[in-house]
């Protein structure tokens, strides 16, 4: 996985919009790369400049210096590179300089380095010797400890091939990862 055209918009707000290249030659990876790049373009098009809005400067909660960003969708990547597996973490959300950080959503895509294909949750469970009962117990424990409802989950492998579970939860007021 590599990136081009970084398109750094704001250093202070850590906003950049790179083009991702998965460098895996199968339809699944090509389709994912195309989808992610389209989403990145859409996020970049969401930028609203501070000079285009009328706000009280005292409402700004971020240190932005002289940068001219009021709000924007963000879209970021992180790679978890293990011996046999490669997981792409995609984080996205919306930033507004007059509000504390909003919800950030996460998606994970785990590839087998041997085959180049995305792994399903079933394949990930098998690799990590994780059962459906293990997942049910983890969900129940998390929901009970945090007084939330897990709306959905996604399994992925970290760089050490440990099975991890990304959860989308609802606490009765907001939904978040």
Which residues are covered by each model-predicted region?
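Compositionally biased intrinsically disordered regions enriched in Thr/Gly
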Residues: 1-177
